[in-house]
Every structure is written in structure tokens, then in C-alpha cells.
Design a protein with these regions (language model features):
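Short hydrophobic alpha-helices and adjacent helix-cap/hinge residues
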Residues: 1-331
């Protein structure tokens, strides 16, 4: 009898693959039997040197009874700031499988929702109406939390007018795919404030510094920045702040970390509340609540932060009345 070596090798490989799949399936069943929850964390960029948002999310889950390393496994995936990788990573988490997937950012939320149709999703989106029609009853397999950034853009423009009454030409800095509604809202209110709006689409890629330089050619008098995930990732907030100070451009943002980096002013939700609320949504799903029954939660805590050191560097005197209303003034 003649034995074919190639056939034996293929047979062994198939057997090994089968045993591997069986072992993985057995391990998953054992985890379920032991009451171990599996949560998918899908991040556009990261992980950075510091992960305050992940730490807040994990700590809140622990307070709610889900402790990593004890009865919780967090499967993490990172897209290296490439949106074209989100769908594949979302599918990978769904097939792992996990009990629920959490992702952040409007574009990432949209890609994940388009890919994953059965695994429960909790999303952090600045514009939730791109995903659902009704915040109270989102339906389907998706719920989440919104920082209400889109709705707050006109308010930020009003604060800019109050801080610098003479400003008229404002550049709306954004990722076009993440902020279709925000720019229109801002355009609608600008004439009432005596302002004209232009838009600059920034991708936050390796050519970010070159993209910033193109802004100067349009000669804006101020920048209104929409917080895309990539634009919010280290070191881009610092690069944006350095560019704006050098170009003598005041900037208005949605989140305080831009102002900590040197931006002029921010008004928006506190990110700690956002990630704590997201963790609470995840915990409810782990306990058996269907995402369609969980209203998308809106931020309730907002803060105004002004960097007076930056204002002085720009030659701007912020009105005392505005400084007194700020939650924090950086000197």
C-alpha cells in the first residue's frame, strides 16, 4: 500500500484546525457557563500612551459588577486611524463572539451599524440622528449616548462672537463625512451673527500639518472645530493649537482637551460623563435588556473652558462677563 505524504499533511492540518475550533468553542461555552461577560471595544485610533476614556469606561463597569479579569473580558480592536478598517474589525468582534460592542465616533458608529446586524451595539456619536430616527426608541440592535455636539455648534459660534465681537470670517474645520448636519446648522445661524462660514475638510492623516497650512490661504479670522475622532487623537490637538497660535487664529472647540493643548475656548459635554453613561448602557445589555428598549442617552453636563494664556498670545482680551461664566479659566 502506497501512502501519499501530501494527503497525510493535509489531513493532519484539517484535524488540527478542527481541534482548534473545538477548543475555542469549548472555551467560550465554559466562559458563558461561568457567567463571564464579553465586551467588544472598537476604537478608530489608539491605544495611546494614556487612555483616560477607556479607564473611565472600565471603572464604571466594575462599579456595576463587571470586573475585568474576574467576570469580564474586554476584547479590544484598533483601526490605526483608518476608517476603512472599521467594518472588518466590527465583524471580527461579532464573530468572536462578544455580548455587546462599544465604539465611538460618528463615522465608526455608522460603519459598525452597517456591518453588525445582530450583536447589540452601544455607540458614542456626536450626531445620533445619522443612525436612528427616534432617540427614545432607537429600534434594532443599536443604542448609545450622544454628546450633542452637532446641536451645540451654533452655541459655540455665539460664544465666539461674544469673545471676539469683530470676527466675521469663520472656518468650519471638520471631517466632511462626520459632520454633514453640523455645518448646515452653523451656516444657518452665521448671518444673524454677522458672520460668513467656510468649510475646511481635514482628514487628520499623515499630511495633517500640510492640511492645516492650506487653511491660512483662505484667510479666516477664526476656526470652529468639529471633533472628529481622528482629529481628536494625540498629537493632533496639540498640532492644531500650535498652528492656530502661530497663525494668530482663535479656535473654538467641543471638548476641553483641545483647550488644554492650547486652543482658545471650548463648550461641550464632559467626556467623563459620556463614557460612564456608555458603560451603564453596556451593563444593562449584559443583564438582558435589549438595545431597542434603551433610549439613546443625551449628555447632561456641559462646561465652558477658556484658555486666557492663549488669548493673550493671540492679542485678544476676553470680556470679563464671559470669563466669569466659564467653568474654568486657564491662565
Amino acid at each position: 500500500m502506497r501512502v501519499n505524504g501530501t494527503g497525510i499533511r493535509i489531513g493532519v492540518a484539517v484535524l488540527a484546525l478542527g481541534l482548534s475550533v473545538f477548543a475555542m468553542s469549548t472555551a467560550l461555552e465554559a466562559q458563558k457557563a461561568a457567567g463571564i461577560a464579553r465586551v467588544g471595544w472598537l476604537e478608530v485610533c489608539g491605544p495611546g500612551p494614556k487612555r483616560p476614556h477607556f479607564d473611565i469606561f472600565r471603572a464604571r463597569l466594575a462599579e456595576l459588577g463587571y470586573v475585568e479579569g474576574k467576570n469580564l473580558i474586554i476584547e479590544q480592536r484598533f483601526a490605526d486611524c483608518r476608517y476603512d478598517r472599521i467594518s472588518g474589525l466590527a465583524a471580527e468582534l461579532a464573530q468572536a463572539p462578544v455580548d455587546v460592542i462599544f465604539t465611538m465616533g460618528t463615522r465608526a458608529a455608522r460603519s459598525t451599524a452597517q456591518t453588525v446586524k445582530t450583536t447589540p451595539l452601544v455607540v458614542y456619536s456626536c450626531d445620533p440622528f445619522l443612525h436612528v430616527k427616534n432617540l427614545a426608541r432607537p429600534g434594532g440592535n443599536l443604542t448609545g449616548v450622544t454628546c450633542m455636539t452637532t446641536e451645540m455648534m451654533p452655541k459655540r459660534l455665539e460664544l465666539l462672537r461674544e469673545a471676539i465681537p469683530t470676527v466675521s470670517r469663520v472656518m468650519f474645520v471638520h471631517d466632511a463625512e462626520a459632520a454633514p448636519n453640523a455645518f448646515k446648522l452653523t451656516q444657518d445661524v452665521a448671518p444673524r451673527l454677522g458672520m460668513t462660514m467656510q468649510a475646511a475638510h481635514l482628514t487628520g492623516t499623515e499630511d495633517f500639518l500640510s492640511e492645516l497650512k492650506t487653511i491660512s490661504k483662505e484667510r479666516p479670522e477664526a476656526l470652529l472645530v468639529y471633533p472628529d475622532v481622528v482629529l481628536s487623537t494625540h498629537p493632533r490637538p496639540q498640532q492644531l493649537a500650535d498652528f492656530a497660535i502661530e497663525a494668530k487664529l482663535p479656535t473654538v472647540h467641543a471638548f476641553r482637551f483641545y483647550v488644554d493643548a492650547g486652543g482658545l475656548m471650548s463648550y461641550g459635554a464632559t467626556t467623563s460623563e459620556i463614557y460612564m453613561t456608555a458603560a451603564e448602557q453596556v451593563a444593562k445589555i449584559l443583564r438582558g435588556v435589549r438595545p431597542s428598549e434603551l433610549p439613546i442617552q443625551q449628555a447632561t453636563r456641559f462646561e465652558l473652558v477658556i484658555n486666557n494664556k492663549t488669548a493673550k498670545a493671540l492679542g485678544i482680551k476676553i470680556p470679563t462677563s464671559l470669563l466669569e461664566r466659564a467653568n474654568e479659566v486657564i491662565e
